[in-house]
Swiss-Prot record:
Protein name: 3-deoxy-manno-octulosonate cytidylyltransferase
Gene this chain is encoded by: kdsB
Disulfide cross-links: none
Superkingdom field: Bacteria
CDD domains xrefs: CMP-KDO-Synthetase
Pfam families assigned: CTP_transf_3
EC number(s) per entry: 2.7.7.38
Chemical reaction(s) catalysed: 3-deoxy-alpha-D-manno-oct-2-ulosonate + CTP = CMP-3-deoxy-beta-D-manno-octulosonate + diphosphate
GO cellular component terms given for this protein: cytosol
Xref: InterPro entries: Cytidylyl_trans, KdsB, Nucleotide-diphossugar_trans
Molecular function per GO: 3-deoxy-manno-octulosonate cytidylyltransferase activity
Length: 248
């Protein structure tokens, strides 16, 4: 099975400007992401950016596609890459964020393989068990519900499912075994990406501020499975990176 990895990378960030170029062991963060994609066995790896500073650095180790500054999401940026690079419609494209230097290569391969094995689904993504009660109630931790077919039913910043009897009797408590956190990695077939970006934004997507709800709103299916490897801690600030580097 072959697949392409597209890595959207933005320079601008209110909490961590220039994050994709931050150095880790002497290499920019984005280079580590490219290396993880290579380890996963991607046939092609493309960094998609609208910033020349990122372009100038990445050209030394990977293919770069310059994209419009007007995109509102990484998926829109990927759609432009698919169009300008003439990627065939049946190609599996994996969206790996440019600020995930320690993403396990196994997870990249897993999400691509899952989509290849689920022809009834338009997308695939991953989740991981929630072990902290605080995370259940944290709106920055997106929860996902999956049916018996391994298809996502809903994504929410709220605690879903809501275990009525227990949680009403025990406010601010939760049975963590019921909850899974969504991991922000996606696989799609290239022709579906072009379809997706032509959908009008959905009401639920705007309410929750979760773009994957657009697919569910329009009746498309998202395969979801627990990741084979634990996901790394997110890097949102320079302090996050410093703490992470202290642990490796």
């Amino acid at each position: 099975m072959s697949f392409t990895v597209v890595i959207p990378a933005r320079f601008g960030s209110s909490r961590f400007p220039g994050k994709p170029l931050a150095l880790i062991d002497g290499k920019p963060m984005i280079q580590h992401v490219v290396e993880r994609a290579k380890e996963a066995g991607a046939e092609s790896i493309i960094v998609a950016t609208d910033d020349e500073r990122i372009q100038n650095v990445v050209e030394g180790f990977a293919q770069v596609c310059m994209t419009s500054v007007d995109h509102q999401s990484g998926t829109e940026r990927i759609a432009e890459v698919i169009q300008t690079q003439n990627i065939s419609g049946d190609t599996i494209v994996v969206n790996v964020q440019g600020d995930e230097p320690f993403i396990p290569a196994e997870n990249i391969k897993q999400v691509a393989t899952n989509l290849a094995n689920a022809p009834q689904c338009q997308m695939a993504t991953l989740s991981t068990p929630i072990v902290s009660v605080a995370d259940v109630f944290n709106p920055n931790i997106v929860k996902v519900l999956v049916n018996e077919k391994g298809e996502s039913i809903y994504f929410s910043r709220s605690p879903i499912p809501f275990e009525r009897d227990y949680m009403m009797a025990n406010p601010n408590k939760a049975n963590t075994a019921l909850y899974n956190r969504h991991i922000g990695i996606y696989a799609y077939r290239a022709d579906y990406v072009n379809q997706y970006v032509n959908y009008a934004p959905s009401a639920l997507e705007q309410i929750e501020s979760l773009e994957q709800l657009r697919a569910i709103w329009y009746g498309d299916k998202i395969h979801c499975e627990v990741a084979v490897a634990p996901p790394p801690v997110g890097i949102d600030t320079p302090e996050d990176l410093e703490r992470l580097l202290e642990t490796i």
